[in-house]
From Swiss-Prot:
General remark: Major glycoprotein, comprises over 80% of the envelope proteins present in virus particle. The extent of infection into host organism is determined by HA. Influenza viruses bud from the apical surface of polarized epithelial cells (e.g. bronchial epithelial cells) into lumen of lungs and are therefore usually pneumotropic. The reason is that HA is cleaved by tryptase clara which is restricted to lungs. However, HAs of H5 and H7 pantropic avian viruses subtypes can be cleaved by furin and subtilisin-type enzymes, allowing the virus to grow in other organs than lungs.
Protein family membership: Belongs to the influenza viruses hemagglutinin family.
Protein localization: Virion membrane; Host apical cell membrane
Name of the protein this chain belongs to: Hemagglutinin
GO function terms (MF aspect): host cell surface receptor binding
The organism of origin for this protein: Influenza B virus (strain B/Finland/56/1988)
Gene3D superfamilies documented for this protein: 3.90.209.20, Hemagglutinin Chain A, Domain 2 (2.10.77.10)
Length: 347
């Protein structure tokens, strides 16, 4: 007879690293990691995902929507997740804006971080009777409205002195900006100022000197001094060439809190304000959103979770996502490998 000892075994290609014994050969493993491949971005399963701020606002940038460009007014859908598809938001196609002087480019991204966003139905200030008035509300051929007449941003009123009596230099004036949102939301109040060459400044405002502006809300105070002249003619989206520029900024007012704006000539007074609440998780990505995915990953796009861990590029991800690990993980589902048993000699 032949007597065999040991267990049935075969060659084992599986090696796992253990905490106590280092590398160990085992008879079977279950892979716990995957290495994703890049894919398009998708809607996050089980939640609303926002791409463009206003999907139905055609030929509009998100900054157009955020500022209330006349032909870019529409509903911003609620969303628990948002795609930051403009890493550096493009300009608005209305009046030429001096973007680099303020944080105006950040406004669309600020709005994107809220779950619910709506524009107020009425104005926060009566611009025509504001201090330093009476004013007429200025419009521009560079900002055509829906009937192709002259228009301007819905979030601001261009306060131009109404008659020669108040078309003069003025000491700084202050206007209070009340809180008008009705559901305890954050109020995002947009304001700004216009400046031009000396000739146009005298024609519009009766003063060609640099003007001073200050906003204050929620403990944040910002100061500006306008630049006079030195601007080349510039047209936006085929509008009329403009020698002037506007500077646009915003302030965030918490529930019930009043803000203030101190200004001289050329002020763009706040009008309709954004009322925003809830949080939307924001991730850098690209449009369009195609289909659905368990996870949105900045480097790989939409991922469906097939394993609990992944290797590859480590980046921000939202949703039901695998966990990043540096090296592949395996779960041993067999026994420690033993070499084939040797046969004992026949007796």
């Amino acid at each position: 007879d032949r007597i065999c000892t040991g267990i049935t075994s075969s060659n084992s290609p599986h090696v796992v690293k253990t905490a106590t014994q280092g590398e160990v050969n085992v008879t079977g493993v279950i892979p716990l990691t995957t290495t994703p491949t890049k894919s398009h971005f998708a809607n996050l399963k089980g939640t609303k995902t926002r791409g463009k701020l206003c999907p139905k606002c055609l030929n509009c940038t998100d900054l157009d929507v955020a500022l209330g460009r006349p032909k870019c007014m529409g509903t911003i859908p609620s969303a628990k997740a948002s795609i930051l598809y403009e890493v550096k938001p493009v300009t608005s196609g209305c009046f030429p804006i001096m973007h680099d002087r303020t944080k105006x480019r950040q406004l669309p991204n600020l709005l994107r971080g809220y779950e619910n966003i709506r524009l107020s139905t009425h104005n926060v200030i009566n611009a025509e009777t504001a201090p330093g008035g009476p004013y007429k509300v200025g419009t521009s051929g560079s900002c055509p409205n829906v009937t192709n007449g002259n228009g301007f941003f819905a979030t601001m009123a261009w306060a131009v002195p109404k008659n020669d009596n108040n078309k003069t230099a003025t000491n700084p004036l202050t206007v209070e900006v009340p809180y008008i949102c009705t559901e305890g939301e954050d109020q995002i109040t947009v304001w700004g100022f216009h400046s031009d060459n000396e000739t146009q400044m005298v024609k519009l405002y009766g003063d060609s000197k640099p003007q001073k502006f200050t906003s204050s809300a929620n403990g944040v105070t910002t100061h500006y001094v306008s630049q006079i002249g030195g601007f080349p003619n510039q047209a936006e989206d085929g509008g009329l060439p403009q020698s002037g520029r506007i500077v646009v900024d915003y302030m965030v007012q918490k529930s019930g809190k009043t803000g203030t704006i101190t200004y001289q000539r050329g002020i763009l007074l706040p009008q309709k304000v954004w009322c925003a609440s809830g949080r939307s998780k924001v991730i850098k990505g690209s449009l369009p959103l195609i289909g659905e995915a368990d996870c949105l990953h900045e480097k790989y796009g939409g991922l469906n979770k097939s394993k609990p861990y992944y290797t590859g590029e480590h980046a921000k991800a939202i949703g039901n996502c695998p966990i990043w690990v540096k090296t592949p993980l395996k779960l041993a589902n067999g026994t420690k490998y033993r070499p084939p048993a040797k046969l004992l000699k026949e007796r």
